A protein has these predicted regions:
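Conserved N-terminal structural module of periplasmic/extracytoplasmic solute-binding proteins
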Residues: 4-8, 18-104, 410-417
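Mature extracytoplasmic/periplasmic domains
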Residues: 49, 271, 305-379
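Extracytoplasmic/periplasmic solute-binding protein
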Residues: 144-148, 154, 172-219, 260
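Hinge/lid segment of periplasmic solute-binding proteins
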Residues: 102-154, 165-173, 282-285
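A structural signal for short loop-to-beta-strand junctions that line the ligand-binding cleft
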Residues: 88-89, 93-96, 124-160, 181-185, ...
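Short helix-initiation/N-cap motifs at beta->coil->alpha
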Residues: 76-86, 243-256, 268
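Glycine-centered hinge/linker elements that transmit conformational signals in sensory
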Residues: 212-247
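Conserved C-terminal helix/tail region of periplasmic/extracytoplasmic solute-binding proteins
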Residues: 364-417
Length: 417
């Protein structure tokens, strides 16, 4: 009797199993997906407005290369300079992949906004990019970003038919005044204003704790000699009739209006300036400036641009794939061809075309006077910008200069990131 009951139980179990198997083969699309159906993947990419058209072409190239998935990629304009301030407000709501300037790496890493790079992507970064750009993407021995340019600096553009003395700031202003043209300098932009402070010998230094948080910040921008020299030079520039405070839009407007004499900018403007000026197009290192009978060479920032991958992305592997593609050799070549953006990829940088590029040659010449844009105090940007704004507004004078410099330097020294 006991054996018969066991047999009946086994029979019932077998019938139930067969029923389940048959149900599984019923052809229900929800339970039996087509193995050939591609996964739909939506990604958001942030980058600067100047590169939007080019970036959209790159996106199409990415989709054409990777046909194993259906990619939908949206490009939103967020400049490299604004990336950290934007994404750290809510990392989970940020882009899957975003471009940023390398000085923001520590802030982004500490905020949990950067996924670490590993595997073949890491090997490719280290093998094919300049040592300085790899260093800029690295914190505590780990790589957190994909380098895509190594030209984040500035130098002098000028019209040879209007400027005969590009070596000195006084000569440039005199030539521009004589030709009825303008010298364009973004004097209320801290990135450019650093040229005067670095040129005068001023500096800052940040030390960090092991977790990336700030330990100490030192800054001598209010030094009685160094700070005063920089401040006086900025005041003198602002008072020149040939000076025009302006950004990229101002450069374009002066080119269009025929009143462009010279400008301090970077490689992203090389195409429009060279095409407009034609045979009168020229570029060189930044000029010297003179204060109280002493001559100083203008300094600058030097850095690179990177792509970061958001670790909260719903499609993390695909985000890494996109960042690697956008920063690879082929796309760095396209950036150079389309916008003359200087590559971090060593093979592209070694090409004859890049070596012969006038703007990149000027940037290379300025490099000896440049300060690496790494470990910049978080308060530097707003503090120096505010000082520059007051110089432009002519509320900074030689009489209150020491006070204004101290206010600026105190804000820098109070930096928390």
């Amino acid at each position: 009797m006991k054996k018969r009951m066991i047999a009946l139980a086994l029979s019932a179990t077998m019938v139930l199993s067969v029923g389940v198997m048959l149900a599984g083969c019923s052809g229900d699309p929800d339970t039996n997906p087509d193995p050939n159906e591609k996964e739909n993947v939506s990604l958001v990419l942030w980058g600067p407005s100047q590169q939007q058209t080019m970036a959209e072409e790159m996106i199409e190239a990415f989709k054409a290369k990777y046909t194993d998935k259906n990619y939908s990629i949206t490009y939103n304009v967020v400049s490299e300079a604004d990336a950290a301030g934007t994404i750290t407000t809510d990392v989970s709501a940020g882009a899957d992949v975003y471009a940023f300037a390398n000085d923001q790496l520590l802030v982004l890493q500490r905020a949990g906004a950067l996924a670490q790079v590993g595997g073949s992507y890491l090997e490719d970064i280290r093998a094919n990019n300049s040592a300085s750009s790899v260093e800029a993407a690295t914190f505590d021995g780990r790589v957190y970003a994909y380098p895509y340019s190594d030209d984040n600096g500035y130098f002098l553009y000028y019209d040879k038919s209007k400027v005969d003395s590009p070596e000195t700031l006084a000569g440039i202003l005199e030539d521009c005044a004589a030709s009825g043209s303008k010298f364009i300098f973004d004097l209320d932009n801290s990135w450019y204003d650093a040229a005067f402070f670095f040129g005068a010998g001023a500096s800052y230094e940040v030390t960090y704790n092991s977790d990336g948080s700030v330990n100490t910040v030192a800054c001598d921008f209010d030094d009685a000699t160094k700070g005063t020299v920089a401040g006086k030079a900025m005041i003198e520039l602002a008072n020149s009739s040939a000076f025009l405070n302006g950004d990229d839009n101002s450069i374009t407007a002066e080119l269009t209006g025929g009143t462009f004499g010279a400008a301090v900018s970077g490689t992203w403007n090389a195409k429009v300036i060279s095409e407009t000026l034609g045979e009168n197009y020229a570029a060189c290192k930044l000029p010297t400036f003179e204060v109280d009978g002493q001559t100083y060479q203008m300094g600058s920032f030097a850095g690179c641009k990177l792509y970061g991958v958001n670790p909260t992305s719903d499609h993390l592997a695909d985000a890494h794939r996109l960042a690697a593609f956008l920063s690879g050799e082929e796309m760095q070549q396209k950036r150079y061809d389309d916008m003359q953006i200087g590559p971090s990829n060593t093979k592209v940088a070694a090409s004859d075309a890049v070596k012969a590029n006038i703007a990149l040659a000027a940037l290379a010449d300025q490099a000896q006077y440049a300060t690496a844009q790494i470990a910049v105090p978080g308060g530097f940007w707003t503090a120096v910008e505010a000082f520059g704004q007051e110089v432009v507004a002519k509320t900074v004078t030689t009489e209150n200069l020491a006070e204004k410099l101290k206010t600026m330097a105190d804000l820098i020294r109070a930096s928390e990131n």
